[in-house]
Design a protein with these regions (language model features):
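Mobile "lid/hinge" segments at catalytic clefts and subdomain interfaces of large enzymes
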Residues: 128, 135-148, 169
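Short hydrophobic/aromatic-enriched beta-strand-loop microsegments
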Residues: 25-28, 41-54, 96, 140-141, ...
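ATP-dependent carboxylate/acyl-activation modules
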Residues: 1-3, 180-484
């Protein structure tokens, strides 16, 4: 039995090759892989000794040869194939172990040139993977170091890999080469200014119990590109498995949290904030956000942009919550909160990044793609269009409300005072309805003066402004654009 090994990621390859040799396999290798194996004391055959042809073009051509692909593709049960191999002096190759040039890592480097990117496009590797994967009934194809131990265990146990494992590895290899080609195609198309095709790559995080409703099947996938404030890369420290609706709500909460640099907390229900506040620290921000709407937060989701301390944990523990998210939890906070077995605690990466991100929204039979809105222009005094100028406190509250209302379902109105929401009017078919809801909530807390109001859309009529003025609102921020 013969194995051909040619890897860029050399993790575990020496141990794998040594294991194959101990099981009686011959090991063939190329360039750097051969050098590493030989220096590590593994008996290895140079690929050039198999092909009878040297590596040429700075290593661009080394395995593209009939003695490689004939040995991989020949069917062991086809007399014509066997005859062709004998006549041409070609021997079987029973395993290919290949991982590809690091194209993704190369193009991710700042300042990388196109020439550098092109030199990291693997040609021979994908060709060998595809040949071996096509002939999976007889050939084992390996593209992931994580599979080395499983393969060695099967050979030790059965004398060779099982047909089932070879089929699984074949599917994995084709997935790997498809992702690799899509990545290269995307890069080249961007350089060429072409956008009529869109290739997407997502990996399964977990199957979900069901979707938005119990009769809908669902799964959770993540993109190959790690980004901050992403639930897909969160670490769950406690609680039940996340549901489809949990994930949607948690994602909406994280979008709000990333708006703030100062200590901040938001409570959220059904993808709308019900209470949000800035504070001195996590405990203070939570207290203010909770007091903004003690009723709606019941069974909700909480997200903070500061580590959860014991003090904050003890304040949150008495309240029934589904999820608490933060950049971290102190050991003392975990001790307090983990006694609630169903409470999901998620540690979410929250480092700042200016990297451009895409937002994908599915429509029936299609997909909308836009840049993710990561820019919120601060509210400043020079934006004022009235003779009366806002105070510094009002400006701070207007800026706070502007960042919150961006994430409320339209028509959206948010009423704010002293760095916390007092009322949130969401999702009404007319703007006055949302204003009435938000102001009613603020007045129910006994606050009837010193308010500011933020609107996610312009006012087509003066009804909202008149209502606000009569309800204790002293300043308004809105995008403008009304012809009236």
């Amino acid at each position: 039995m013969r194995a051909l090994i040619s890897v860029s990621d050399k993790t575990g390859v020496v141990e794998f090759a040594r294991g194959l040799r101990e099981l009686g396999w011959q090991v063939i290798a190329t360039g750097g892989t051969m050098k590493l194996l030989a220096e590590s004391g593994v008996e290895v055959i140079n690929i050039s000794d198999v092909t009878g042809f040297p590596e040429i073009c700075d290593g661009r051509v080394k395995t593209l040869h009939p003695k490689v692909h004939g040995g991989l593709l020949a069917r062991r049960d086809d007399p014509n194939h066997l005859k062709a191999l004998r006549e041409n002096g070609i021997e079987f190759i029973d395993m290919v172990c290949v991982n590809l040039y690091p194209f993704r890592q190369t193009i991710a480097r700042e300042g990388v040139t196109m020439d550098e990117a092109i030199e990291n496009i693997d040609i021979g590797g994908p060709s060998m993977l595809r040949s071996a994967a096509k002939n999976y009934k007889d050939v084992t194809v390996v593209c992931d170091p994580a599979d080395y131990d499983t393969i060695l265990a099967e050979i030790r146990g059965y004398g060779n890999t099982t047909p089932r494992l070879r089929l699984q590895l074949s599917a994995k290899a084709y997935t790997h080469t498809a992702e690799y080609d899509a990545m290269i195609a995307t890069y080249m198309r961007e350089k060429a200014g072409l956008d009529e095709k869109l290739f997407l790559e997502f990996d399964l995080v977990q199957p979900l119990r069901y979707g938005e409703n119990p009769h809908q099947q669902a799964k959770f996938y993540r993109s190959g590109e790690r980004v901050p404030y992403s639930l897909a890369y969160a670490r769950q420290l406690n609680g039940k498995e996340m549901s489809y609706n949990n994930i949607q709500d948690a994602n909406a909460a994280l979008a709000i949290v990333r708006e703030f640099d100062e200590p901040f907390c938001v409570g959220l229900k059904h993808m709308n904030p019900c209470g949000a506040a800035v504070g001195r620290d996590a405990a203070d921000a939570w207290t203010k956000a909770y007091e903004a709407d003690k009723v709606s937060i019941f069974g909700g989701i909480v997200a903070l942009n500061r580590p959860v301390t014991r003090e904050a944990a003890e304040l949150m523990k008495p309240i029934f919550l589904e999820i608490i998210m933060a950049p971290s939890f102190t050991p003392e906070a975990l001790e307090v909160l983990s006694t609630k077995k169903n409470l999901r605690l998620l540690e979410v990466p929250m480092e700042k990044s200016d990297a451009k991100q895409r937002q994908l929204v599915s429509v029936t039979g299609g997909l909308l793609v836009q840049d993710l809105d990561l820019e919120t222009r601060p509210v400043t005094a020079d934006m004022c269009v009235t003779e009366k100028r806002p105070t510094e406190r009002q400006l701070a509250d207007l800026d706070f409300g502007w960042r919150i209302v961006k994430h409320v379902k339209s028509n959206a109105i948010v009423v704010v005072k002293d760095g916390r929401t007092l009322g949130v009017g969401a999702g009404q078919m007319n703007r006055i309805g949302s204003a009435e809801l938000a102001l009613k909530q603020a007045h129910a807390q006994g606050v009837t003066e010193g308010l500011v109001l933020a609107s996610d859309g312009f006012f087509p009529f003066d009804d909202c402004v008149s209502l606000a003025a009569a309800s204790g609102v002293e300043a308004i921020v809105q995008p403008g654009g009304s012809v009236r």
